[in-house]
Swiss-Prot record:
InterPro entries: Ribosomal_bL17 (IPR000456), Ribosomal_bL17_sf (IPR036373). This is Large ribosomal subunit protein bL17. NCBIfam families: L17. The lineage of its organism: Bacteria, Pseudomonadati, Bacteroidota, Flavobacteriia, Flavobacteriales. Part of the 50S ribosomal subunit. Contacts protein L32. Residues 125-181 are annotated as: Disordered. Residues 140-181 have a biased composition (Basic and acidic residues). Residues 128-139 have a biased composition (Basic residues). It comes from Christiangramia forsetii (strain DSM 17595 / CGMCC 1.15422 / KT0803) (Gramella forsetii). One of its GO terms (cellular component) is cytosolic large ribosomal subunit. The gene is rplQ. GO terms for molecular function: structural constituent of ribosome. Keywords: Ribonucleoprotein, Ribosomal protein. It holds the Pfam family Ribosomal_L17.
Length: 181
């Protein structure tokens, strides 16, 4: 029976599993997103969320607790320096797991793990404003060019009408020349 066994051991012994999760967490903090299997992604989410919660309160004690899990000075400093200000008002749910499908070699279910506040695709609050301003500017330019293009077209039509009239007298002159001869 499986009573009281809440942790996914991921087919590894304790030291190997802890080292793997620490390395994956350091990579996630450094790159803000990583690709891995779904099982590892779920285990990583459980591993990283409490660390990010601890980094919101920058004390020596919290830094030492996070360092004991991550074992990387660079990751700890980046977590407290860059990640903490962005997630300061978020009450949890700092990571997102997106399923990607099966891996080609062994058909393992793959997932993308990312820090929520560092993704530009889903953070649409800033981008649409930029797009709208560029679109509006683009439309005004096209309207200006369209309004300037219409008089050109009208003047082009007038010149076309004038040209056939100019050609017709030449034709008549030729006919008159032939009659006179």
């Amino acid at each position: 029976m499986r009573h009281g066994k809440k942790i996914n051991h991921l087919g590894r012994q304790t030291a190997h599993r802890k080292a793997m999760l620490a390395n994956m967490a350091c990579s996630l903090i450094e790159h803000k997103r990583i690709n891995t299997t779904v099982a590892k992604a779920k285990a990583l989410k459980v591993f990283v969320e409490p660390l990010v919660t601890k980094c919101k309160n920058d004390t020596t004690h919290n830094r030492r607790l996070v360092f004991s899990k991550l074992r990387s000075k660079e990751a700890v400093s980046e977590l407290f320096r860059e990640v903490a200000p962005k997630v300061g008002d978020r009450p949890g749910g700092y990571t997102r797991v997106i399923k990607l499908g099966s891996r080609l070699g062994d058909a393992a279910e793959m997932a993308l793990v990312e820090l929520v506040d560092f993704n530009e695709t889903y953070n649409v609050g800033e981008k649409p404003k930029k797009k709208k301003s560029t679109r509006r500017a683009g439309k005004k330019k096209t309207e200006d060019t369209a309004s300037t293009a219409e008089p050109k077209e009208a003047s082009a039509k007038e010149t076309k009408k004038e040209e056939p009239k100019a050609k017709e007298p030449k034709a008549e002159e030729k006919k008159d020349d032939k009659k006179e001869e």
